[in-house]
């Protein structure tokens, strides 16, 4: 065989291989990999770092670690000048709480909670007897703390060496009298951009870089100069801001110096971590709750929604309810970091969703603030322990007025660096529509007289009908440009979504209603049936006793009757494989690192430097 014939044979094999890949549905790379396939060795999992950034907690670790390091996602920065005003991002407090209508809304929400508690019978078939706060108040007002020890054992962070910044627990325990600003770089699942000090995009990214770098050095014991040998898997929210994701990827690759990155959505990673292929993911975090339906590794765009409340709101609501019952620790302040930690602890210790626990009960708790005596308080609580977590189902009880409480997946923001962003596609689509209309007009004008006579009643509106069909199709495609496989979704799902945008974005949906809405936006009854049969709850915001049974009862009672007849069981899973629900998404990121298919998803530093955000469109596991 001649050299030319050999070359033709090899070219034929390559073309045949490409054709076979296309038939299998493998994406043809728009941007060729700068690292040849022959040199792309299997990436060792212990050189992959999985990062799951939350609003309150950062979870970070090697893909081979059994558990990640979990640290408060906060930084304290020293004042650059003396006399600089003190600034600290709030934790339990938020905008919209002190409006004139807030208290009335709280009371109305609490009435709905009490009605729901009364309407559901206990396991013995009897109604639950309500306990008024007045029954506990007289006892609690008389209680005084007992001194356990003159030293609590906790100390403020030592700042005598004037560190420029402190991270995690050290930042939380900075003395308020020291000259440090406190920043939480992520709020309600998004970058904490605000008009105050440290609220610019550049400042927030700088805070995140410092926190993550500190965690990698301290907890993973990896020198920052060695990050060029490591790759990163970054978990992002299902409803994400493209600009923010782009900046985070740029920071990880170009500033921190990782050699490669894979970006994936929290919900899909939660399915990997739980071992479920198709499920409705309910992620109840500290500051936001997100719901979406995932099927075979794809997060259905139309089913995604984010609720702007979570565990912190339950803690604040619990404090309000305890105050009504005469909470004996009267110095408690929501602006104090130590008191916020205490309230979170009290919520996790006492709150539940068990209808069978009723009546007044005695409790005690300790206060161990730094450089203060250790105090023991005793007090009584009744229905407050059940009412607070039920606020997740009746969010009016949070008393938040004038804030956007529900977010659905919106059309994407344009990006000048991305030549194929949605704005470009919509503009070219509009030109195609105009061209099609002009062609249709010309064809109708050039028809023979006899033909026109046969269609006399229809010819005048034929181009308009043709154009309207194209426009409808175009709008359906335009709505599905940002996130994947949605061009195949039924028109009914699209209309359901458009109606939802107008109806729900101004309202605070309860958790059960949000789940029902998300499942209802699935494109087929078969998919809806799958989702009703498997609801996975992750995150730390719903870790209450009997939460599984409570949520299951709410979904069963409110789901459409047509599905209630055909679905044998609504399965609510709160601890898959007996795992901590707060770690499931991170664990899924670690599983993702070990999959063979992940090798095609890596974005390398040199590629990002050359092609930028276009690499996300090419390599992301979801449609960018």
From Swiss-Prot:
Compartments (UniProt record): Nucleus; Chromosome
GO biological-process terms attached to the record: cell division; chromatin remodeling; DNA recombination; double-strand break repair; positive regulation of DNA repair; positive regulation of DNA-templated transcription; positive regulation of telomere maintenance in response to DNA damage; regulation of cell cycle
Chief location category: nucleus
Keyword set, alphabetical order: Acetylation, ATP-binding, Cell cycle, Cell division, Chromosome, DNA damage, DNA recombination, DNA repair, Mitosis, Nucleotide-binding, Nucleus, Phosphoprotein, Transcription, Transcription regulation
Stated name of the protein: Actin-related protein 8
Cellular component per GO, a single term: Ino80 complex
Highest rank taxon of the organism: Eukaryota
Upper taxonomic lineage: Eukaryota, Metazoa, Chordata, Craniata, Vertebrata
Molecular-function GO terms, alphabetical: ATP binding
Record's keyword annotation contains Phosphoprotein: yes
Biased composition regions of type Basic and acidic residues, renumbered to the chain: 1-25
InterPro entries per record: Actin, ATPase_NBD
Biological source species: Homo sapiens
Subunit structure: Component of the chromatin remodeling INO80 complex; specifically part of a complex module associated with the DBINO domain of INO80. Interacts with ACTR5; the interaction is observed in asynchronous (interphase) cells but not in metaphase-arrested cells indicative for a possible dissociation of the INO80 complex in mitotic cells. Exists as monomers and dimers, but the dimer is most probably the biologically relevant form required for stable interactions with histones that exploits the twofold symmetry of the nucleosome core.
PANTHER family given in the database record: ACTIN
Family note: Belongs to the actin family. ARP8 subfamily.
Sequence positions bearing N-acetylmethionine: 1
Post-translational modification Phosphoserine, affected residues: 132, 412
CDD domains associated with the record: ASKHA_NBD_Arp8-like
Binding site for ATP: 55-56, 283-286
Residue segments, region Disordered: 1-29, 430-462
Name of the gene: ACTR8
Role according to the record: Plays an important role in the functional organization of mitotic chromosomes. Exhibits low basal ATPase activity, and unable to polymerize.
């Amino acid at each position: 065989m001649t050299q030319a014939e050999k070359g033709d044979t090899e070219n034929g094999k390559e073309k045949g291989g490409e054709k076979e890949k296309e038939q299998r549905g493998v994406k043809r790379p728009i941007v060729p990999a700068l690292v040849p396939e022959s040199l792309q060795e299997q990436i060792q999992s212990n050189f992959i770092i999985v990062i799951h950034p939350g609003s309150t907690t950062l979870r970070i670790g090697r893909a081979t670690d059994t558990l990640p390091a979990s640290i408060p996602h906060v930084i304290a920065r020293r004042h650059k000048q003396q006399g600089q005003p003190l600034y600290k991002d709030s934790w339990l407090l938020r905008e919209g709480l002190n409006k004139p209508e807030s208290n009335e809304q709280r009371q109305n929400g609490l009435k709905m909670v009490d009605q729901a508690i009364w309407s559901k019978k206990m396991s013995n078939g009897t109604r639950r007897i309500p306990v008024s706060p007045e029954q506990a108040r007289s006892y609690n007002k008389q209680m005084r703390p007992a001194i356990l020890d003159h030293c609590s054992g906790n100390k403020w962070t030592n700042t005598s060496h004037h560190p420029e910044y402190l991270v995690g627990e050290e930042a939380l325990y900075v003395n308020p009298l020291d000259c440090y600003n406190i920043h939480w770089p992520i709020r309600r699942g998004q970058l904490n951009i605000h008009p105050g000090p440290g609220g610019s995009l550049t400042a927030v990214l700088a805070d995140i870089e410092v926190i993550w770098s500190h965690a990698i050095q301290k907890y993973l014991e990896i020198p920052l100069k060695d990050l060029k040998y490591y790759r990163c898997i970054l978990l992002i929210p299902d409803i994400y801001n493209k600009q923010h994701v782009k900046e985070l990827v740029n920071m990880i690759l170009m500033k921190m110096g990782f050699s490669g990155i894979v970006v994936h959505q929290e919900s899909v990673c939660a399915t990997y971590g739980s071992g479920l292929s198709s499920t409705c993911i309910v992620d109840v975090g500290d500051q936001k709750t997100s719901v979406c339906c995932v099927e075979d590794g794809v997060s259905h765009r139309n089913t995604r929604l984010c609720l702007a409340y979570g565990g912190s709101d339950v803690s604040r609501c619990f404090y309000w309810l305890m105050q009504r019952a005469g909470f004996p620790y009267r110095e408690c302040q929501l602006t104090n970091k130590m008191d916020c930690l205490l309230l979170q602890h009290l919520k996790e210790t006492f709150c539940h969703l068990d209808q069978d626990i009723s009546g007044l009960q005695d409790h005690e708790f300790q206060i161990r603030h730094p450089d203060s005596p250790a105090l023991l308080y005793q007090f009584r609580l009744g229905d407050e322990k059940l009412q607070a977590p039920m606020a997740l189902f009746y969010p009016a009880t949070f008393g938040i007025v004038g804030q956007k409480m529900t977010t659905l997946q919106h059309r994407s923001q344009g990006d000048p660096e991305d030549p194929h962003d949605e704005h470009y596609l919509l503009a070219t689509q509009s030109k195609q529509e105009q061209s099609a209309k002009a062609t249709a007009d010309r064809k109708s004008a050039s028809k023979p007289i006899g033909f026109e006579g046969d269609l006399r009643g229809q010819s005048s509106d034929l181009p308009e009908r043709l154009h309207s069909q194209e426009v409808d199709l175009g709008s359906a495609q335009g709505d599905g440009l940002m996130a994947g496989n949605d061009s195949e979704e039924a028109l009914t799902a699209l209309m359901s979504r458009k109606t939802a945008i107008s109806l729900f974005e101004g309202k605070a949906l309860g958790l059960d209603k949000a789940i029902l809405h998300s499942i209802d936006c699935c494109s087929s009854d078969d998919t809806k049936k799958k989702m009703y049969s498997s609801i996975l709850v992750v995150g730390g915001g719903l870790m209450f006793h009997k939460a599984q049974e409570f949520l299951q009862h709410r979904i069963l009672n409110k789901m459409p009757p047509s599905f209630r007849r055909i679905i044998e069981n609504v399965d609510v899973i709160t601890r898959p494989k007996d795992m901590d629900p707060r770690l499931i998404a991170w664990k899924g990121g670690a599983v993702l690192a070990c999959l063979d298919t992940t090798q095609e998803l890596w974005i390398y530093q040199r590629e990002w430097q050359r092609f930028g955000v276009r690499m996300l469109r090419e390599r992301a596991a979801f449609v960018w």
